[in-house]
Structure formats: C-alpha cells, structure tokens
C-alpha cells in the first residue's frame, strides 16, 4: 500500500496536505477507503464551520458501513469538494486526490502531532497484528 511521503496522517486515518498558502487539504487514506469499500454517500462540513481537533465533522458511507471523519486539526472550513459529495466513488478511485475539505488551521503546532508517512505505516502494521 502506498503512503505518500509528503502528507501527514491522523491515527483516525485522515491525511492532510500542507498547502503553500498555509491552508491544509484533508482526505481519508487508502487504508480507510479499502476498509470501508465502495463509497455511496459523503456528507461534508459547511464552509465557515469552526472545528476542534478530532471533532467529528463529516460522514462517509459505503456499502459496508458509515464512518465519521474527524478533523485532524482545529480550524475553519474554507472549502469542500462538492465533486466527492456528488460522486463518492472518486474516493475509491484515488483517495489521495479525492480530498474532502480544506481548513485554515487555528494552530499550526497541531501539525507536529500528526504522523509522517513512516509513522503511519508503523500504525498500519501494528493494527494488522
């Protein structure tokens, strides 16, 4: 399984990409979408919503289960990916390009608490045993 090195990861299987303008893009990992299976519904947070770190803020539903998505960082939702709301299967096609929402972080120090690719791979290995 490919774990992109340029991203950071939450233990709850969300990824973040730090953008050049200081905002972050959030999605779910390949591992998460594989566990869930074929996506059928996505509910994203409203633009302007203020999120606390680890607050449940979105829902993805698959043919197997529904799962909450947690904010990997605190901040304000500044954009959502309406394309995945109308075509949830895009998450299955490529979970790293089918982002869910963008945040303006309230506290960039929280990024340091997230896992790097190596740390996330170790988490997956420990989950497998």
Curated annotation (Swiss-Prot):
Top-level taxon in the UniProt lineage: Bacteria
Cofactor note: Binds 1 lipoyl cofactor covalently.
Task performed by this protein: The glycine cleavage system catalyzes the degradation of glycine. The H protein shuttles the methylamine group of glycine from the P protein to the T protein.
GO terms, biological process: glycine decarboxylation via glycine cleavage system
Protein name: Glycine cleavage system H protein
Cofactors (names): (R)-lipoate
Oligomeric and partner information: The glycine cleavage system is composed of four proteins: P, T, L and H.
One Pfam family per UniProt: GCV_H
Modified sites of kind N6-lipoyllysine: 64
Family classification: Belongs to the GcvH family.
Domain called Lipoyl-binding: residue spans: 23-104
Keywords on record: Lipoyl
Coiled-coil region(s): none
PROSITE patterns: BIOTINYL_LIPOYL, LIPOYL
A cellular component annotation (GO) from this entry: glycine cleavage complex
Name of the coding gene: gcvH
InterPro entries: 2-oxoA_DH_lipoyl-BS, Biotin_lipoyl, GCV_H, GCV_H/Fam206, GCV_H_sub, Single_hybrid_motif
Originating species: Nitrosomonas eutropha (strain DSM 101675 / C91 / Nm57)
């Amino acid at each position: 399984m490919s774990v992109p090195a340029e991203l950071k990861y939450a233990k709850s299987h969300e990824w973040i990409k730090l953008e050049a303008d200081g905002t972050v893009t959030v999605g779910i990992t390949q591992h998460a979408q594989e566990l869930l299976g074929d996506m059928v519904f996505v509910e994203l947070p409203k633009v302007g919503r203020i999120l606390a770190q680890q607050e449940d803020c979105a829902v993805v539903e698959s043919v197997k289960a529904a799962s909450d998505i947690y904010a990997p960082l605190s901040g304000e939702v500044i954009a959502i990916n309406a394309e995945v709301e109308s075509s949830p299967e895009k998450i299955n096609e490529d979970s790293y390009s089918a982002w869910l929402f963008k945040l303006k972080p309230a506290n960039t120090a929280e990024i340091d608490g997230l896992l790097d690719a190596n740390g996330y791979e170790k988490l997956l290995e420990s989950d497998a045993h």
